[in-house]
Protein backbone atom coordinates (compact mmCIF):
# COMPACT_ATOMS: atom_id res chain seq x y z
CA UNK A 1 0.00 0.00 0.00
CA UNK A 2 1.30 3.42 -0.92
CA UNK A 3 1.45 6.12 1.78
CA UNK A 4 -0.82 8.27 -0.34
CA UNK A 5 -3.53 5.62 -0.06
CA UNK A 6 -3.76 6.07 3.71
CA UNK A 7 -6.45 8.62 4.70
CA UNK A 8 -5.06 11.91 5.98
CA UNK A 9 -6.80 11.56 9.37
CA UNK A 10 -5.18 8.15 9.93
CA UNK A 11 -1.77 9.57 9.00
CA UNK A 12 -2.25 12.40 11.51
CA UNK A 13 -3.29 9.96 14.25
CA UNK A 14 -0.31 7.75 13.51
CA UNK A 15 2.02 10.74 13.64
CA UNK A 16 0.53 11.89 16.92
CA UNK A 17 0.92 8.42 18.39
CA UNK A 18 4.56 8.39 17.33
CA UNK A 19 5.17 11.77 18.99
CA UNK A 20 3.51 10.62 22.23
CA UNK A 21 5.49 7.37 22.19
CA UNK A 22 8.71 9.30 21.66
CA UNK A 23 7.94 11.68 24.54
CA UNK A 24 7.14 8.76 26.84
CA UNK A 25 10.35 6.96 25.84
CA UNK A 26 12.45 10.07 26.47
CA UNK A 27 10.75 10.69 29.82
CA UNK A 28 11.41 7.11 30.88
CA UNK A 29 15.01 7.33 29.71
CA UNK A 30 15.61 10.59 31.56
CA UNK A 31 13.87 9.22 34.63
CA UNK A 32 16.07 6.12 34.53
CA UNK A 33 19.24 8.17 34.11
CA UNK A 34 18.35 10.69 36.82
CA UNK A 35 17.49 7.88 39.20
CA UNK A 36 21.04 6.55 39.04
CA UNK A 37 23.87 7.40 41.37
CA UNK A 38 23.29 7.91 45.06
CA UNK A 39 20.22 10.15 44.90
CA UNK A 40 17.35 8.94 47.07
CA UNK A 41 14.47 10.30 45.04
CA UNK A 42 10.95 10.45 46.48
CA UNK A 43 8.54 7.74 45.33
CA UNK A 44 6.53 8.65 42.24
CA UNK A 45 2.82 7.97 42.04
CA UNK A 46 2.03 4.99 39.81
CA UNK A 47 0.43 5.44 36.41
CA UNK A 48 1.30 6.63 32.94
CA UNK A 49 4.58 8.62 33.12
CA UNK A 50 3.30 11.65 31.20
CA UNK A 51 -0.40 12.03 31.94
CA UNK A 52 -1.04 9.73 34.91
CA UNK A 53 -0.38 12.43 37.48
CA UNK A 54 -2.45 14.96 35.57
CA UNK A 55 -5.45 12.63 35.53
CA UNK A 56 -5.27 12.05 39.28
CA UNK A 57 -4.69 15.74 39.97
CA UNK A 58 -7.67 16.84 37.88
CA UNK A 59 -9.93 14.44 39.76
CA UNK A 60 -9.19 16.46 42.89
CA UNK A 61 -5.94 17.49 44.62
CA UNK A 62 -7.07 16.58 48.14
CA UNK A 63 -8.31 13.04 47.29
CA UNK A 64 -5.05 12.52 45.39
CA UNK A 65 -2.94 13.71 48.32
CA UNK A 66 -4.92 11.55 50.75
CA UNK A 67 -4.49 8.47 48.57
CA UNK A 68 -0.77 8.96 47.95
CA UNK A 69 0.02 9.92 51.55
CA UNK A 70 -1.48 6.61 52.67
CA UNK A 71 0.36 4.67 49.97
CA UNK A 72 3.72 6.46 49.71
CA UNK A 73 4.14 8.51 52.88
CA UNK A 74 4.74 12.19 53.56
CA UNK A 75 7.03 12.78 50.55
CA UNK A 76 6.05 11.85 46.99
CA UNK A 77 6.33 13.15 43.45
CA UNK A 78 3.53 13.68 40.96
CA UNK A 79 4.56 13.92 37.28
CA UNK A 80 2.29 16.30 35.37
CA UNK A 81 3.15 16.42 31.66
CA UNK A 82 6.68 17.92 31.62
CA UNK A 83 6.75 19.05 35.27
CA UNK A 84 7.34 17.17 38.48
CA UNK A 85 5.57 18.30 41.65
CA UNK A 86 6.98 16.95 44.91
CA UNK A 87 4.64 17.11 47.91
CA UNK A 88 5.98 17.61 51.42
CA UNK A 89 3.24 16.84 53.94
CA UNK A 90 3.74 17.60 57.63
CA UNK A 91 6.10 19.73 59.73
CA UNK A 92 8.85 17.10 59.76
CA UNK A 93 9.49 17.50 56.02
CA UNK A 94 8.22 20.99 55.17
CA UNK A 95 10.64 23.19 57.13
CA UNK A 96 12.83 23.98 54.10
CA UNK A 97 9.71 24.78 52.07
CA UNK A 98 8.90 27.60 54.50
CA UNK A 99 12.40 28.63 55.59
CA UNK A 100 14.36 28.40 52.34
CA UNK A 101 15.51 31.70 50.88
CA UNK A 102 14.39 32.97 47.49
CA UNK A 103 17.50 31.62 45.76
CA UNK A 104 16.53 28.14 46.95
CA UNK A 105 12.72 28.17 47.07
CA UNK A 106 11.06 30.77 44.87
CA UNK A 107 7.45 31.93 44.68
CA UNK A 108 7.80 33.97 41.53
CA UNK A 109 7.68 31.25 38.86
CA UNK A 110 4.71 29.36 40.33
CA UNK A 111 2.57 32.44 41.00
CA UNK A 112 3.24 34.42 37.82
CA UNK A 113 -0.28 33.61 36.62
CA UNK A 114 -1.41 36.43 38.96
CA UNK A 115 0.44 39.09 36.94
CA UNK A 116 -2.47 39.93 34.57
CA UNK A 117 -4.70 40.43 37.63
CA UNK A 118 -2.37 42.41 39.88
CA UNK A 119 -0.81 44.26 36.96
CA UNK A 120 2.73 45.04 35.80
CA UNK A 121 5.47 46.17 38.13
CA UNK A 122 4.22 44.61 41.35
CA UNK A 123 4.62 41.43 43.41
CA UNK A 124 5.29 38.51 41.05
CA UNK A 125 6.19 40.71 38.07
CA UNK A 126 9.30 42.14 39.76
CA UNK A 127 12.53 40.63 40.99
CA UNK A 128 12.92 39.55 44.59
CA UNK A 129 14.64 42.70 45.87
CA UNK A 130 11.83 44.94 44.60
CA UNK A 131 9.19 42.50 45.84
CA UNK A 132 10.72 42.60 49.32
CA UNK A 133 10.47 46.39 49.33
CA UNK A 134 6.83 46.18 48.28
CA UNK A 135 6.18 43.67 51.07
CA UNK A 136 7.71 46.26 53.40
CA UNK A 137 4.99 48.66 52.23
CA UNK A 138 2.39 46.04 53.23
CA UNK A 139 4.06 45.56 56.61
CA UNK A 140 4.04 49.29 57.32
CA UNK A 141 0.38 49.52 56.29
CA UNK A 142 -0.46 46.76 58.78
CA UNK A 143 1.49 47.98 61.81
CA UNK A 144 -0.30 48.05 65.16
CA UNK A 145 -0.99 51.79 65.01
CA UNK A 146 -2.62 51.37 61.59
CA UNK A 147 -4.62 48.35 62.73
CA UNK A 148 -6.04 50.40 65.59
CA UNK A 149 -7.53 52.89 63.16
CA UNK A 150 -8.80 50.08 60.92
CA UNK A 151 -10.68 48.50 63.86
CA UNK A 152 -12.70 51.68 64.36
CA UNK A 153 -13.75 51.49 60.70
CA UNK A 154 -14.53 47.76 60.95
CA UNK A 155 -16.78 48.32 63.95
CA UNK A 156 -18.55 51.26 62.29
CA UNK A 157 -19.22 49.22 59.14
CA UNK A 158 -20.62 46.29 61.15
CA UNK A 159 -22.89 48.53 63.22
CA UNK A 160 -24.24 50.28 60.14
CA UNK A 161 -24.74 47.06 58.18
CA UNK A 162 -26.58 45.09 60.86
CA UNK A 163 -28.71 48.08 61.87
CA UNK A 164 -30.64 47.41 58.65
CA UNK A 165 -31.73 43.95 59.83
CA UNK A 166 -35.19 43.69 61.37
CA UNK A 167 -36.15 42.48 64.83
CA UNK A 168 -36.13 38.92 63.53
CA UNK A 169 -35.82 37.12 60.23
CA UNK A 170 -34.00 34.59 58.09
CA UNK A 171 -30.85 35.40 56.11
CA UNK A 172 -28.10 33.68 54.16
CA UNK A 173 -25.21 34.21 56.54
CA UNK A 174 -22.67 33.54 53.80
CA UNK A 175 -24.08 36.27 51.55
CA UNK A 176 -24.41 38.77 54.40
CA UNK A 177 -20.85 38.31 55.62
CA UNK A 178 -19.39 38.35 52.10
CA UNK A 179 -21.11 41.67 51.46
CA UNK A 180 -20.04 43.18 54.78
CA UNK A 181 -16.43 42.05 54.28
CA UNK A 182 -16.16 43.79 50.90
CA UNK A 183 -17.69 46.95 52.39
CA UNK A 184 -15.18 46.87 55.23
CA UNK A 185 -12.28 46.15 52.89
CA UNK A 186 -13.34 49.06 50.70
CA UNK A 187 -13.29 51.39 53.69
CA UNK A 188 -10.01 50.19 55.25
CA UNK A 189 -8.02 49.32 52.14
CA UNK A 190 -9.38 51.05 49.05
CA UNK A 191 -10.35 54.31 50.71
CA UNK A 192 -13.23 56.61 51.57
CA UNK A 193 -13.76 57.71 47.97
CA UNK A 194 -14.41 54.15 46.81
CA UNK A 195 -16.57 53.25 49.81
CA UNK A 196 -18.78 56.34 49.64
CA UNK A 197 -19.02 57.10 45.91
CA UNK A 198 -17.77 54.24 43.77
CA UNK A 199 -18.51 51.08 45.74
CA UNK A 200 -20.93 49.45 43.29
CA UNK A 201 -18.70 50.15 40.29
CA UNK A 202 -15.50 48.98 41.96
CA UNK A 203 -17.19 45.92 43.46
CA UNK A 204 -18.38 44.83 40.01
CA UNK A 205 -14.89 45.35 38.57
CA UNK A 206 -13.31 43.27 41.33
CA UNK A 207 -15.89 40.57 40.61
CA UNK A 208 -14.68 40.42 37.00
CA UNK A 209 -11.07 40.31 38.20
CA UNK A 210 -11.90 37.49 40.59
CA UNK A 211 -13.69 35.46 37.93
CA UNK A 212 -10.73 36.03 35.62
CA UNK A 213 -8.67 33.56 37.64
CA UNK A 214 -9.79 30.16 36.34
CA UNK A 215 -8.03 26.78 36.67
CA UNK A 216 -6.86 27.20 33.05
CA UNK A 217 -5.33 30.56 34.04
CA UNK A 218 -2.63 28.83 36.07
CA UNK A 219 -1.17 27.31 32.90
CA UNK A 220 -2.31 29.86 30.31
CA UNK A 221 -2.93 33.24 32.01
CA UNK A 222 -3.08 35.15 28.71
CA UNK A 223 -5.36 32.78 26.81
CA UNK A 224 -7.96 34.96 25.01
CA UNK A 225 -11.03 33.46 26.68
CA UNK A 226 -14.03 35.62 27.69
CA UNK A 227 -13.16 35.51 31.42
CA UNK A 228 -9.65 36.80 30.70
CA UNK A 229 -10.95 39.54 28.43
CA UNK A 230 -13.33 40.74 31.15
CA UNK A 231 -10.46 40.56 33.65
CA UNK A 232 -8.22 42.73 31.48
CA UNK A 233 -10.97 45.28 30.86
CA UNK A 234 -11.75 45.49 34.58
CA UNK A 235 -8.07 45.85 35.47
CA UNK A 236 -7.68 48.76 33.04
CA UNK A 237 -10.77 50.52 34.43
CA UNK A 238 -9.57 50.10 38.04
CA UNK A 239 -6.26 51.67 37.06
CA UNK A 240 -8.15 54.70 35.73
CA UNK A 241 -10.29 55.00 38.89
CA UNK A 242 -7.38 54.84 41.31
CA UNK A 243 -5.22 57.15 39.21
CA UNK A 244 -7.97 59.78 39.52
CA UNK A 245 -8.25 59.29 43.30
CA UNK A 246 -4.47 59.43 43.79
CA UNK A 247 -4.16 62.63 41.73
CA UNK A 248 -7.01 64.21 43.69
CA UNK A 249 -5.47 63.39 47.06
CA UNK A 250 -2.07 64.69 46.03
CA UNK A 251 -3.53 67.89 44.58
CA UNK A 252 -5.63 68.65 47.66
CA UNK A 253 -3.00 67.58 50.17
CA UNK A 254 -5.58 65.50 52.02
CA UNK A 255 -4.50 62.38 53.90
CA UNK A 256 -6.68 59.46 54.96
CA UNK A 257 -6.34 56.55 57.41
CA UNK A 258 -6.37 53.71 54.89
CA UNK A 259 -4.03 51.37 53.04
CA UNK A 260 -4.34 53.42 49.86
CA UNK A 261 -2.76 56.38 51.65
CA UNK A 262 0.02 54.17 53.03
CA UNK A 263 0.91 53.02 49.53
CA UNK A 264 0.76 56.58 48.15
CA UNK A 265 3.20 57.72 50.86
CA UNK A 266 5.56 54.73 50.49
CA UNK A 267 9.04 55.14 49.06
CA UNK A 268 11.67 52.69 47.91
CA UNK A 269 15.11 52.66 49.55
CA UNK A 270 16.52 54.83 46.76
CA UNK A 271 13.93 57.51 47.52
CA UNK A 272 11.65 56.80 44.56
CA UNK A 273 7.94 57.14 45.39
CA UNK A 274 5.42 54.57 44.27
CA UNK A 275 3.71 55.12 40.93
CA UNK A 276 -0.04 55.19 40.39
CA UNK A 277 0.18 51.83 38.64
CA UNK A 278 2.11 50.28 41.52
CA UNK A 279 -0.36 51.60 44.09
CA UNK A 280 -3.27 50.12 42.12
CA UNK A 281 -1.54 46.75 41.79
CA UNK A 282 -0.64 46.58 45.47
CA UNK A 283 -4.22 47.43 46.46
CA UNK A 284 -5.59 44.70 44.20
CA UNK A 285 -3.12 42.20 45.68
CA UNK A 286 -4.10 43.22 49.22
CA UNK A 287 -7.81 42.83 48.54
CA UNK A 288 -7.34 39.45 46.86
CA UNK A 289 -5.20 38.23 49.76
CA UNK A 290 -7.73 39.13 52.42
CA UNK A 291 -11.26 39.32 51.08
CA UNK A 292 -11.86 35.61 50.49
CA UNK A 293 -10.11 34.43 53.64
CA UNK A 294 -12.10 36.77 55.87
CA UNK A 295 -15.52 36.14 54.33
CA UNK A 296 -15.07 32.36 54.13
CA UNK A 297 -13.63 32.04 57.64
CA UNK A 298 -16.20 34.32 59.27
CA UNK A 299 -18.95 32.15 57.77
CA UNK A 300 -17.35 28.84 58.80
CA UNK A 301 -16.82 30.23 62.32
CA UNK A 302 -20.50 31.08 62.61
CA UNK A 303 -21.65 27.77 61.14
CA UNK A 304 -19.56 25.77 63.59
CA UNK A 305 -20.55 27.83 66.63
CA UNK A 306 -24.21 27.37 65.71
CA UNK A 307 -23.77 23.64 65.12
CA UNK A 308 -21.88 23.13 68.39
CA UNK A 309 -23.81 25.49 70.59
CA UNK A 310 -21.54 25.10 73.61
CA UNK A 311 -18.92 27.17 71.80
CA UNK A 312 -21.45 29.85 70.91
CA UNK A 313 -22.44 29.97 74.59
CA UNK A 314 -18.80 30.21 75.68
CA UNK A 315 -18.20 33.05 73.22
CA UNK A 316 -21.26 34.90 74.58
CA UNK A 317 -20.02 34.47 78.16
CA UNK A 318 -16.66 35.86 77.10
CA UNK A 319 -18.43 38.92 75.70
CA UNK A 320 -20.18 39.41 79.04
CA UNK A 321 -16.86 39.28 80.87
CA UNK A 322 -15.32 41.77 78.45
CA UNK A 323 -18.31 44.11 78.76
CA UNK A 324 -18.02 44.05 82.56
CA UNK A 325 -14.55 45.55 82.18
CA UNK A 326 -15.07 47.84 79.19
CA UNK A 327 -18.80 48.40 78.70
CA UNK A 328 -19.99 48.54 75.08
CA UNK A 329 -16.65 49.79 73.78
CA UNK A 330 -14.85 47.80 71.06
CA UNK A 331 -11.31 48.65 70.02
CA UNK A 332 -8.06 46.93 69.02
CA UNK A 333 -6.94 46.12 72.57
CA UNK A 334 -10.37 44.89 73.67
CA UNK A 335 -10.61 42.54 70.68
CA UNK A 336 -7.16 41.19 71.63
CA UNK A 337 -8.59 40.01 74.97
CA UNK A 338 -11.10 37.65 73.31
CA UNK A 339 -9.28 34.31 73.49
CA UNK A 340 -12.41 32.13 73.20
CA UNK A 341 -13.52 33.84 70.00
CA UNK A 342 -9.94 33.70 68.69
CA UNK A 343 -9.79 29.93 69.19
CA UNK A 344 -13.18 29.47 67.50
CA UNK A 345 -11.90 31.34 64.45
CA UNK A 346 -8.54 29.57 64.44
CA UNK A 347 -10.18 26.13 64.55
CA UNK A 348 -12.50 27.00 61.66
CA UNK A 349 -9.40 28.05 59.71
CA UNK A 350 -7.61 24.82 60.58
CA UNK A 351 -10.44 22.75 59.15
CA UNK A 352 -11.09 25.02 56.16
CA UNK A 353 -8.03 26.95 54.99
CA UNK A 354 -9.06 28.80 51.82
CA UNK A 355 -5.83 27.85 49.99
CA UNK A 356 -5.59 24.09 49.59
CA UNK A 357 -2.03 24.17 48.22
CA UNK A 358 1.07 26.33 48.60
CA UNK A 359 3.75 26.17 45.89
CA UNK A 360 7.43 26.95 45.41
CA UNK A 361 9.99 26.41 42.64
CA UNK A 362 13.12 24.59 43.82
CA UNK A 363 16.36 26.14 42.56
CA UNK A 364 18.74 23.81 44.39
CA UNK A 365 18.82 20.23 45.62
CA UNK A 366 17.83 19.65 49.23
CA UNK A 367 17.19 16.73 51.57
CA UNK A 368 14.25 16.00 53.86
CA UNK A 369 13.84 13.41 56.61
CA UNK A 370 10.43 11.94 57.41
CA UNK A 371 9.21 11.24 60.94
CA UNK A 372 9.96 7.56 60.23
CA UNK A 373 13.60 8.45 59.53
CA UNK A 374 13.59 8.05 55.73
CA UNK A 375 15.70 10.53 53.80
CA UNK A 376 14.83 11.83 50.33
CA UNK A 377 16.75 14.09 47.96
CA UNK A 378 14.54 16.67 46.24
CA UNK A 379 16.12 17.70 42.92
CA UNK A 380 16.57 21.20 41.63
CA UNK A 381 13.84 22.09 39.15
CA UNK A 382 10.96 20.38 40.94
CA UNK A 383 7.88 22.33 41.89
CA UNK A 384 7.50 21.78 45.62
CA UNK A 385 4.07 21.79 47.25
CA UNK A 386 2.45 21.43 50.61
CA UNK A 387 -1.24 21.39 51.52
CA UNK A 388 -2.74 23.29 54.47
CA UNK A 389 -6.04 21.47 53.94
CA UNK A 390 -4.39 18.08 54.44
CA UNK A 391 -1.51 18.92 56.78
CA UNK A 392 -3.87 20.70 59.21
CA UNK A 393 -5.66 17.38 59.80
CA UNK A 394 -2.73 15.05 60.44
CA UNK A 395 -3.73 12.70 63.29
CA UNK A 396 -0.26 12.56 64.85
CA UNK A 397 -0.52 16.32 65.43
CA UNK A 398 -4.22 16.90 66.13
CA UNK A 399 -6.39 14.66 68.29
CA UNK A 400 -9.61 13.76 66.42
CA UNK A 401 -8.42 15.98 63.57
CA UNK A 402 -11.74 16.11 61.70
CA UNK A 403 -13.63 17.38 64.77
CA UNK A 404 -14.29 21.04 65.54
CA UNK A 405 -12.55 21.54 68.88
CA UNK A 406 -11.37 25.11 69.57
CA UNK A 407 -10.08 24.06 72.99
CA UNK A 408 -7.25 22.17 71.28
CA UNK A 409 -5.50 25.56 71.11
CA UNK A 410 -6.17 26.40 74.76
CA UNK A 411 -3.82 26.35 77.76
CA UNK A 412 -2.55 22.88 78.59
CA UNK A 413 -3.13 21.48 75.10
CA UNK A 414 -1.86 23.84 72.41
CA UNK A 415 -1.64 20.99 69.93
CA UNK A 416 -0.23 23.16 67.16
CA UNK A 417 2.71 24.27 69.31
CA UNK A 418 3.37 20.86 70.86
CA UNK A 419 4.16 19.42 67.43
CA UNK A 420 6.63 22.17 66.57
CA UNK A 421 6.89 24.81 63.86
CA UNK A 422 4.77 24.56 60.71
CA UNK A 423 2.16 22.30 62.33
CA UNK A 424 -0.55 24.90 61.65
CA UNK A 425 -0.18 26.46 58.19
CA UNK A 426 -3.51 28.09 57.38
CA UNK A 427 -1.60 31.37 57.00
CA UNK A 428 1.52 29.77 55.55
CA UNK A 429 4.65 30.38 57.59
CA UNK A 430 8.35 31.12 57.58
CA UNK A 431 9.66 33.62 55.06
CA UNK A 432 6.31 33.94 53.30
CA UNK A 433 3.81 33.91 56.15
CA UNK A 434 0.65 35.91 55.50
CA UNK A 435 1.22 39.57 56.36
CA UNK A 436 -2.53 40.11 56.72
CA UNK A 437 -3.12 37.55 59.48
CA UNK A 438 -3.60 40.15 62.27
CA UNK A 439 -5.94 42.18 60.03
CA UNK A 440 -8.02 39.08 59.23
CA UNK A 441 -8.45 38.09 62.88
CA UNK A 442 -9.39 41.64 63.88
CA UNK A 443 -11.92 41.91 61.07
CA UNK A 444 -13.62 38.60 61.91
CA UNK A 445 -13.53 39.34 65.64
CA UNK A 446 -15.08 42.78 65.13
CA UNK A 447 -17.96 41.30 63.13
CA UNK A 448 -18.70 38.42 65.49
CA UNK A 449 -18.34 40.61 68.57
CA UNK A 450 -21.20 42.74 67.26
CA UNK A 451 -23.29 39.69 66.34
CA UNK A 452 -22.74 37.91 69.68
CA UNK A 453 -23.76 41.03 71.58
CA UNK A 454 -26.87 41.83 69.56
CA UNK A 455 -28.43 38.66 68.12
CA UNK A 456 -29.51 35.12 68.81
CA UNK A 457 -29.09 32.67 65.92
CA UNK A 458 -30.27 29.27 64.77
CA UNK A 459 -28.80 27.36 61.82
CA UNK A 460 -31.76 26.19 59.72
CA UNK A 461 -30.09 24.88 56.55
CA UNK A 462 -27.96 21.72 56.41
CA UNK A 463 -24.40 22.16 57.64
CA UNK A 464 -22.39 23.54 54.69
CA UNK A 465 -19.79 21.75 52.59
CA UNK A 466 -16.62 22.89 50.85
CA UNK A 467 -16.91 24.25 47.32
CA UNK A 468 -13.96 22.45 45.78
CA UNK A 469 -14.67 23.92 42.34
CA UNK A 470 -13.40 27.37 43.28
CA UNK A 471 -9.75 28.46 43.02
CA UNK A 472 -10.05 29.62 46.63
CA UNK A 473 -12.04 26.93 48.42
CA UNK A 474 -15.21 28.51 49.73
CA UNK A 475 -18.58 27.29 50.95
CA UNK A 476 -21.06 25.52 48.71
CA UNK A 477 -24.60 26.84 48.68
CA UNK A 478 -26.41 28.94 51.25
CA UNK A 479 -25.93 29.06 55.02
CA UNK A 480 -29.42 29.98 56.19
CA UNK A 481 -29.92 31.18 59.75
CA UNK A 482 -32.82 32.53 61.78
CA UNK A 483 -31.92 35.59 63.81
CA UNK A 484 -33.60 37.45 66.63
CA UNK A 485 -32.41 40.79 67.87
CA UNK A 486 -31.53 41.08 71.56
CA UNK A 487 -29.22 43.13 73.75
CA UNK A 488 -26.67 41.23 75.79
CA UNK A 489 -27.38 41.72 79.50
CA UNK A 490 -24.37 42.01 81.78
CA UNK A 491 -24.70 41.42 85.53
CA UNK A 492 -22.62 43.86 87.55
From Swiss-Prot:
Xref: InterPro entries: CYP450_sterol_14alpha_dmase, Cyt_P450, Cyt_P450_CS, Cyt_P450_E_grp-IV, Cyt_P450_sf
A single MF term (Gene Ontology): heme binding
Biological pathway: Steroid biosynthesis; zymosterol biosynthesis; zymosterol from lanosterol: step 1/6
Top-level taxon in the UniProt lineage: Eukaryota
Top-rank EC class of the record's enzyme: oxidoreductase
An annotated GO BP: methylation
Cofactors required: heme
Electron transport among keywords: no
Recorded catalytic activity of this chain's protein: a 14alpha-methyl steroid + 3 reduced [NADPH--hemoprotein reductase] + 3 O2 = a Delta(14) steroid + formate + 3 oxidized [NADPH--hemoprotein reductase] + 4 H2O + 4 H(+)
SUPFAM superfamilies in the cross-refs: Cytochrome P450
Family listed: Belongs to the cytochrome P450 family.
Entry-linked PANTHER family: 24-HYDROXYCHOLESTEROL 7-ALPHA-HYDROXYLASE (PTHR24304:SF2), CYTOCHROME P450 FAMILY 7 (PTHR24304)
The protein's name: Obtusifoliol 14-alpha demethylase
GN (gene name): CYP51
